[in-house]
Amino acid sequence: MKALVRKLGNIHPDHQRIFKGAFRVAVFLLLGKAAGAIKEMAVAYRYGVSDAVDAYQFTMTMGTWLPVTIVGVLSVVLIPVLVRLARTGGAEKELFIRELQGWVAAAGVALALLTWFAWPYVVERLGQGLSAQVRAMTGDLLIAFAPVAALLLIAGISAARLRAQERHVNTLLDSVPAVATLAWVMLAASAEGVGPLLWGTLVGYAIQTVWLAWLAARADGGFWGAPKLTLRSPHWPELMGAAGVMLIGQVAMSFVGPLDQYAAANLGANANATLGYASRLLSLLLGIGAVSVGRAALPVLADVQARGDTARARSMALKWSLLMVAAGAGAVALGWVLAPWGVSVLFERGAFTAENTAAVAHVLRWGLLQLPFYFGVLILVQLLASQNRYRIMAAIAVANFALKAVLNTVLAPRMGAAGIMLATSLMYVLSFACYLAVAMRKAEPKEAD
């Protein structure tokens, strides 16, 4: 035992920072995903595989894809900037945060209005396979998801401020919307309509946004960062250039969710709901297994890059990536065997039948195949982000989306919702191969590759 402790103590401090951060994120993710799983159990109990769940899944995916995409881009390009600003601090950092929060808040309001007014066209174009009742329900749910578009942007900035300081409590607060929805669904007098899903979602995201803002201010010594609509910070050109390039790839990848919803909607027979249950179970494994390491790695790798030690950052990322591939392969084997049991334990009660369990487990198994490649690629994404290699990242993302779009049209008609999951798995095979090939190159990255 003492020998093991000594061996662990000899691990490089940067590896220890990633491990400790990943452990904290994994614990928070486990708690958060547990809350999410309980919420899904409650939804399955009250609604089963029904029109209400179809509407909820469709509206949540379509209504949040753009703000989630923007937050994803900002997180990747913001954290290295915030890590560097942490070394300087003072008025320069405060000005940047105030301006950032001002423009993000303005963009959030604009995005909420855009979501509201564009929704009829979204449903008309992408929800052609939905019944009239489901379409009407999506309109009701928009009362929640239009404001949520703005709240997601504001919360994303607060989360990035926390992550830049290697504080990962924001991961735990990702569960707040699920907890609020759970409470509304279980306390509702009946499961008629989508009211409990609507109000639980809206209140949950509002609480999460305020809570994250308070934690970010406390982490910055009480600095809230009153919004300011100016562009005087010298960091804007760097940030906007990187964000513009990243947004191209991220928008392409963000269409994967709506693309899946479109394919499932055209399959009919509540395929949206079946795919949604399987996807949310899969997200539990993806989150705990890979997101924990990815979120912990970016600020550490950015700090190593800021010190000028590019070779160490590359070596660290490759070691962690291969370790995560092995862990993902083990998760596939275990998950394939336990899929029917897991779906049954979580969902099979109330309106959710044994037939529903078999359908969701079948789809889930095909989705499990993505685990090794998703696990492995996420740490390599953080490496390239810390090196500002955004053009390469954008190109890989566009290639991923192109492959996914082709495979959906080929596999979904033949395999149903399982084909949609298999297409996602093959997409991540391509992604991992591309990122590994780029990461293996020993050439020094350019300033803005």
Where are these regions (language model features)?
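Interhelical loop/hinge segments that connect adjacent transmembrane helices in multipass membrane
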Residues: 2-18, 22, 213-253, 441-449
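Short membrane-interface helical motifs at transmembrane helix boundaries
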Residues: 111-132, 332-354
